[in-house]
Structures are given as structure tokens and as C-alpha cells.
């Protein structure tokens, strides 16, 4: 009987995961609203004011890093723009996101031991994210059959995390970001979980933060065990969120309360 219930639970997770994937992939892009649609008038004005938007500080720093450490290899920024909207990507049998790629590139220049939230990493991520603004989000699954199967397993894993109740609060991602869109939670307006603009500047952080930091904050909010930065669960969840955002326009680094 235990085995039967376990199999039934897994089947339920699989069916729910597939239904989420199919629903969001089939929904027209114009019917899906990004987080920017739910900003207060104050934050929306701040995001549009280039003289006051704090993200400009990280853009300037990222531009300097690009010219100093990256331009010699990549030359034209337009050559890397498209790849920004394709992360997380499959590399060496695992998922990596934009910050992972930056850390790997820095390591080649003997800049080792950097974390995802390192200010140089975040600044360059902010600059590159901004360069891809306006492009359509489009993932690039691996072409090789065996690798594609592993990639799909990670996507399914992310979908299961999304619908799994977490922590002492016993909430799942879908309960907030699909079933309670537009409602207030701790002074924040709940938006759909479409990944269209990162890194983000959160006023409550007073700094820029990566997707990892935002997801880990959600784990903390529901009082669940928090995965370490770069954990497989975080990458799989990011892949799922990016997958359901396919077809939407990338908005670049964003501001939140």
C-alpha cells in the first residue's frame, strides 16, 4: 500500500508538472504579465528615471568590467546578447545560469573563489542583462539525445519544486504566483512567476541581487530549508521559470520593493 501511494503521488506530481508546462507554453505572450506590470507608480517612475534609478550604478561598473576583462575575448557585445536570454544553459552535464558562466570566465583570468553575489559578478550580470533587453526569451536545450533527456529531467524537477508545498508555512510557488496574483503579501503585490528581468534591485536589500538570492529569500519566507547558492534545485527551478516565460520579452535588470 505504501508503494502504491508513493507511485500515485509521483504520478500526480508528473501530471501537474506537465499541465503547468503545457498551459504556460500555449498561452499567448500578450496575455502574460511580467512583474513590472505590478509595480507601484512610484517604483515604475523610478525604474524609468535614468538619473535616479540605482541600477545605473551597477550598469556603469559592469560596463567597465566588460571593457577591461571581457571585450578582448568577445569583441562585439551584440555577439553575446542572444545567449543572455537562453540561460540557464546545459554545459558539462549540468545547468548553469548567467552568474555561473561569469564566475567560470573570471576563473580563467585567475579571479577564483567568487560567489554569485560578488559585486563584480552581479555588476557584469546586470550589464549583460541590460544589453539583451527587448529580445524574446528562448531556451536552447541540448541537441544530443542523451543530454536532452537529462535537461528535460531537470525541467521536470523544477516543475515539481514549483508545485511542492514547502516549509512550516506549507506553501508552494504555484499557490502564490498562479492562484493569488495581484493580492498583497507582506506589503508586496504578488506577481506571476515569469522570469523576465534579473538581476533585481530590491529596496529592502538596498543592493542588486541574483535569481539565486531571490529564490532563497522565498525559501526563507515559507520557513523551509534554504538550498545553498548554486544548488541543483535552484537551477532546476530557474529553468522551469524561464521555460514558462518563453516568448515574453526580456526586460533587463529590474527594480522591486
Can you say where each PLM-predicted feature lies in the sequence?
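Long compositionally biased, domain-poor regions of proteins
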Residues: 64, 158-163, 172, 185, ...
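Surface-exposed interaction/gating patches
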Residues: 63, 129-184
